[in-house]
UniProtKB/Swiss-Prot annotation:
The lineage of its organism: Eukaryota, Fungi, Dikarya, Ascomycota, Saccharomycotina. It is found in: Nucleus; Cytoplasm; Cytoplasm, Cytoskeleton; Cytoplasm, Cytoskeleton, Spindle pole. Phosphorylated by CDC28. Phosphorylation is required for BMH1 and BMH2 interaction. Dephosphorylation by GLC7 depends on the presence of BMH1 and BMH2. Induction: Induced during G2-M transition. One of its GO terms (cellular component) is nucleus. The keyword Nucleus applies. Strong overexpression results in the accumulation of filamentous structures resembling the neurofibrillary tangles found in cells of patients with Alzheimer disease. Overexpression is lethal in haploids and causes very poor growth in diploids. GO terms for molecular function: microtubule binding; structural constituent of cytoskeleton. It comes from the Eukaryota. Residues 254-284 form a coiled coil. This is Filament protein FIN1.
């Protein structure tokens, strides 16, 4: 009876649901655990991104292989070793020699100083085509972008043209500007030699003729139309006048008074001189009559 009880396989007590439907060979725990279940891959698993270990986790991981330090001490047998000459097939211009490599022996570490790379020597003298982002930014800031070929031609033509031709073009442009009623219809070349002082003088004359009052009335009407239907708050305004006392006399007022006195003296002297001149003229006219 004891042998039969030992042969009896261990049963999974936890898995009670649907135990009757499971075959007898799957009922054994060891058999069930030894067999791997079928992997069913769904579409959702394909869409997921690949799982990677974060760098924080990898830092703390211990390597099974011993990692060597960055600078390894050279052994005693290789301290006086000189490497043989090697010829590079890719770079025939590079000639390796023992003179280029300087070996400095110390007690602990062998320091090897290598010469400059031959590729750096060959490509250092070549001018680089194009430019980086900083240069383009500088050009755009100070030159208003790179000049087009048409613009360069225009500048060259302007330098080549003599001064007489320029004066003739300016005269023609001025006459055409007078005849043309609309300035916007004219090309830029004709508007180039225009004098703005004439326009400013015209504006000043127009203001004197009464255009200023007309513009004021128009602006007032427009503001009234715009403000229709709006609730306005009463604006309280105060006009304050400051009067200086009479005893305060500044330097400017003194200077003005002196200038006024000088002008009055000049006018008085002018009248005296005019009266004297008139008397002399009368005397000169009366002398020939007596004769």
């Amino acid at each position: 009876m004891s042998n039969k009880s030992n042969r009896r396989s261990l049963r999974d007590i936890g898995n009670t649901i649907g135990r009757n439907n499971i075959p007898s060979d799957k009922d054994n725990v060891f058999v069930r655990l030894s067999m791997s279940p079928l992997r069913t891959t769904s579409q959702k698993e394909f869409l997921k991104p690949p799982m990677r270990i974060s760098p924080n986790k990898t830092d703390g991981m211990k390597h099974s292989i011993q990692v060597t330090p960055r600078r390894i001490m050279s052994p005693e047998c290789l301290k006086g070793y000189v490497s043989k000459e090697t010829q590079s097939l890719d770079r025939p211009q590079f000639k390796n020699s023992n003179k280029n490599v300087k070996i400095q022996n110390s007690d602990h570490i062998t320091n090897i100083i290598f010469p400059t790379s031959p590729t750096k020597l060959t490509f250092s003298n070549e001018n680089k085509i194009g430019g980086d982002g900083s240069l383009t930014r500088i050009r755009a800031r100070f030159k208003n972008g790179l000049m087009s070929p048409e613009r360069i031609q225009q500048q060259q033509q302007q330098h080549i043209l003599p001064s007489d031709a320029k004066s003739n073009t300016d005269l023609c442009s001025n006459t055409e500007l007078k005849d043309a009623p609309f300035e916007n219809d004219l090309p830029r070349a004709k508007l180039k030699g225009k004098n703005l002082l004439v326009e400013l003088k015209k504006e000043e004359e127009d203001v004197g003729n009464g255009i200023e009052s007309l513009t004021k009335s128009n602006t007032k009407l427009n503001s009234m139309l715009a403000n229709e239907g709006k609730i306005h708050k009463a604006s309280f305004q105060k006009s304050v006048k400051f009067k200086l006392p009479d005893n305060i006399v500044t330097e400017e007022t003194v200077e003005l008074k002196e200038i006024k006195d000088l002008l009055l003296q000049m006018l008085r002297r002018q009248r005296e001189i005019e009266s004297r001149l008139s008397n002399i003229e009368l005397q000169l006219t009366e002398i020939p009559k007596h004769k």
